[in-house]
Design a protein with these regions (language model features):
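Compact, glycine-rich, soluble single-domain proteins
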Residues: 2-151
Length: 151
């Protein structure tokens, strides 16, 4: 008798992100680089300055910023999701496309910051990360703003 495998997906509780909050968390900023080979560039979610009416101290924001693992794919290298020997696409296809929200590893990758030119009220820059295509952990199927960063 064949074994039945069940696929389990984990979704955030609030599936409908506020469009204004989503635009603030993932502003339209160019990363200033293009990925080479099988690498992917992910824009990490910006961290709010306050939660509710409580203004977060700088140390808390920095901790959350560097422990944030939710991002948006902004660029794919020319060899992303391809067999490096044959240059053919992976049989299962691409795991993520540009515009998809993903979970990335807490450690690893190359990170850099870009300032938002027209955002004078928020001095916090946008954080980008380059990592290998096979290092993406998951596609976010729920609200990317509802996931918490864990230290």
């Amino acid at each position: 008798m064949s074994e039945v495998k069940k696929i389990v997906t984990f979704e955030a509780t609030d599936d409908t992100p506020n469009p204004e909050e989503l635009a603030w968390a993932f502003p339209d900023v160019k990363p200033g680089m293009a990925p080479l080979g099988g690498r992917v560039i992910v824009q990490l979610r910006r961290i709010k300055k306050k939660t509710g009416r409580i203004v977060l101290v700088e140390e808390t924001k920095e901790n959350e910023k560097w422990n944030n693992m939710i991002g948006k794919v902004v660029a794919l290298g020319p060899l992303a999701y391809k067999n490096r020997d044959t240059m053919q696409s992976w049989p299962e296809g691409s795991w993520a496309q540009v515009g998809d929200f993903v979970r990335v590893p807490k450690w690893g990758g190359d990170r850099w910051e870009i300032r938002v030119p027209s955002d004078e009220e928020n001095e916090d820059p946008v954080l980008f990360m380059t990592l290998n295509d096979h290092e993406l952990i998951a596609t976010v199927t729920g609200n990317p703003l509802s996931f918490k960063a864990y230290v």
